[in-house]
Amino acid sequence: MKFILHIIALALPLWGVGGSLHAQSLKDLFLKMPQEVCPVLSEYNRLEIVDNQKNDKTMQTRNLFRTFSEMKELTDDYAHLVISKNSEKEFKMLTKNDGTRIIMVISTILCDDIPDSSVAFYSTEWKPLRTLDYYTLPPIDNFRKVTIDKATSQLTVTTTNAPLKLSIEGSNQPKEPFTLTNTFRWSTEESRFILND
């Protein structure tokens, strides 16, 4: 009887019972990520990236657009995915004041070599969270590049007020863009990013 109880106790984590007792790594969550978060990567593509890392290969896969996407870095709490030459995503695990972990996803596209980023937050079950609960955007609504320091969780937002380069005859010279940089730090106590002074 003791032997049977011992076998059941060992098998419970495999069945998902007690699985919440250990924190999931970003690698695990990347594999479970819904395709809506990164539509060009199928479940197979994500599995191939993680398998390539385990086998010390380039973490690259042919995505659904039949071009290559490459994971530049994948750790237990940070990931940097280059989707195409004009698109990338960064993932960072953050801890709130109650110990709950959330995932921040920074999506960046290049528009005429000017980066434009958006930030989204998710639970570890990949349920979308309200961004304004964790981060307030700078007041300028033009192009922004958002980066995160994977070690300190410091968020840097560079906003560029760049003019459009559209003109009928090509005679309008674009003026130099105005650039503003704001730096935020993650506050576990407040469970949100706070603008550095």
Model-assigned labels for residue ranges:
Residues M1-D28:
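Bacterial Sec-dependent N-terminal signal peptides
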Residues A23-K96:
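Terminal domain-start segments
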Residues E70-H80, F121-D133, W186, E190:
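Surface-exposed loop/turn elements that mediate protein-protein interactions on large endomembrane-trafficking
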Residues L81-V82, T108-P115, I168-E176:
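Short consensus segments that form the blades of beta-propeller domains
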Residues N86-E90, M104-I106, I114-V119, I140-F143, ...:
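Short, surface-exposed coil-to-beta transition loops
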Residues E90-D98, R144-A151:
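Structural signature of eukaryotic scaffold interfaces centered on beta-propeller domains
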Residues D98-D133:
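Mid-length scaffold segments of soluble, non-membrane domains
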Residues R130-D197:
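Short aromatic loop motif centered on NTY/YTY
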